[in-house]
Amino acid sequence: MNDFTLNAQVRSDLGKGASRRLRRNAALVPAVIYGGNNAPQSISILAKDFAKLLENEASFSHVLNLNVDGQNESVLIKALQRHPAKGFVLHADFVRVVAGHKLTATVPLHFINQETSVGVKKQGGEILHNLNEVEVSCMPQDLPEFIEVDMANVEVGQVLHMTDIKLPKGVELVALAHGSDLPVANVHAPRVSKEDAPKEEDAAE
């Protein structure tokens, strides 16, 4: 069993009441698998195993192996419903990954060279992240665990857009395919405090 494998079992007792009983009595997370050429399938997963998997950021952008009563399913995490106060998972949606067909998935952005960025180190600016993740389209074998955004040469006042990101081979950004070149990050000038602001008499001189 690797880090991206989960054991699951088919569930036939459906509905909100059944889901509550699963979570309360058996510490199981109710979930559903859909997509591909097969019908949706309701399953349950051990809550502690799922929680451990989710500790790894890569689990959200990695093809997972679901072992459902001995039958393997390649899936992606599509959506999680969490408890509003305690944060644990109440329900999960998985979408099937079909070999030979492109998939869409949300991938985290990793920003590198921030402290040594021209706009920060030489110009005293501050970096602001507009996005922390992006939706990508690619073949299953090309799905990256994360995408790097290099901030090394970004200056104060400069905005980095999606078209500025160097993408891994075979990976496309869904937003760009729809004509939206969204801002990803920028370096803005440092805020000037009242103490540092020039006084009126100084400005008059």
From Swiss-Prot:
SUPFAM superfamilies according to UniProt: Ribosomal protein L25-like
Keywords: Ribonucleoprotein, Ribosomal protein, RNA-binding, rRNA-binding
Molecular function terms, GO-annotated: 5S rRNA binding; structural constituent of ribosome
One Pfam match: Ribosomal_TL5_C
Ribosomal protein listed as a keyword: yes
Single GO cellular component term: cytosolic large ribosomal subunit
Gene Ontology biological process terms in this record: translation
Superkingdom per UniProt: Bacteria
InterPro entries named among the record's database cross-references: Rbsml_bL25/Gln-tRNA_synth_N, Ribosomal_bL25/Gln-tRNA_synth, Ribosomal_bL25_b-dom, Ribosomal_bL25_C, Ribosomal_bL25_long, Ribosomal_L25_dom, Ribosomal_uL5_bac-type
Stored NCBIfam families: bL25_bact_ctc, PRK05618.1-2, PRK05618.1-5, PRK05943.1
Purpose of the protein: This is one of the proteins that binds to the 5S RNA in the ribosome where it forms part of the central protuberance.
SUBUNIT field: Part of the 50S ribosomal subunit; part of the 5S rRNA/L5/L18/L25 subcomplex. Contacts the 5S rRNA. Binds to the 5S rRNA independently of L5 and L18.
Entry similarity comment: Belongs to the bacterial ribosomal protein bL25 family. CTC subfamily.
Stated name of the protein: Large ribosomal subunit protein bL25
Natural source organism: Stutzerimonas stutzeri (strain A1501) (Pseudomonas stutzeri)
Gene: rplY
